[in-house]
Design a protein with these regions (language model features):
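Short beta-strand/loop element within the Bergerat-fold HATPase_c
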Residues: 77-89
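Acidic ATP/Mg2+-coordinating residue in the GHKL
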Residues: 97
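Conserved glycine-rich
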Residues: 143-144
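A conserved beta-strand-to-alpha-helix junction within the catalytic ATP-binding
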Residues: 18-34
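Short conserved segments within the C-terminal catalytic ATPase subdomain
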Residues: 36-46
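Short conserved segment of the HATPase_c
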Residues: 102-116
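Short helix-loop "hinge" at the ATP-lid/N-box region of the Bergerat-fold HATPase_c
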Residues: 70-71
Length: 176
């Protein structure tokens, strides 16, 4: 928890001017998450690619956190897809799973620090409820937006839209 809080407190100071190609980064994330996905029998699939300017370390953390959550809170034998769509000035990253879904009333709250939809399942997998808050902060710092695109008892898709251009100002989006 301390490490995550330190990461969050230092986000403003991180340079966001690196050229990032997402497909190789996603493959690295899948390799890092293979022990967990193998243990839970969750299949990981990547589709698409894109190039953007930002912080390599922060974009890695953003996609890692979304993908890790999709694996952790999935059904045994489920699937996770990470899809990247490159548009002219925007990049769309969608992480979808075949999990249990996020109730409508919690879809904005999940991006707040320390929030947990299901505290009993969260204890099983560890963490303190900062992963999606960090995703929101990183997205904001890159001038983008993050949202629950869809969610039902058949799974969830979280979409992140980021500008592809050079270092941007934080979007100032509000999650309250």
């Amino acid at each position: 928890m301390t490490r995550t809080l330190l990461e969050m407190s230092n986000l403003q100071q991180v340079a966001r001017n690196e050229r990032i190609q997402l497909a190789p980064m996603i493959e690295e994330i899948f390799t890092d998450l293979a022990p967990l996905s193998d243990k839970l029998g969750v299949t990981l699939t990547a589709e698409g690619d894109g190039i953007m300017t930002g912080s390599d370390a922060l974009i890695y953390r953003l996609i890692f956190n979304l993908t890790e959550n999709a694996v952790k809170y999935n059904r045994p034998g489920g699937s996770v897809w990470v899809r990247v769509t490159q548009k002219t000035e925007k990049l769309l990253i969608c992480v979808s799973d075949t999990g249990y879904g996020i109730p409508e009333e919690y879809r904005r709250s999940i991006f707040q620090p320390f929030f947990r939809v299901d505290k009993s399942r969260s204890r099983e997998y560890g963490g303190v409820g900062l992963g999606l808050s960090l995703v929101w902060e990183i997205t904001n710092l890159h001038g983008g937006c993050v949202r629950v695109e869809e969610s039902s008892d058949k799974g969830t898709t979280i979409a992140v839209e980021l500008p592809t251009g050079a270092e941007t100002e934080p979007s100032g989006a509000d999650i309250s």
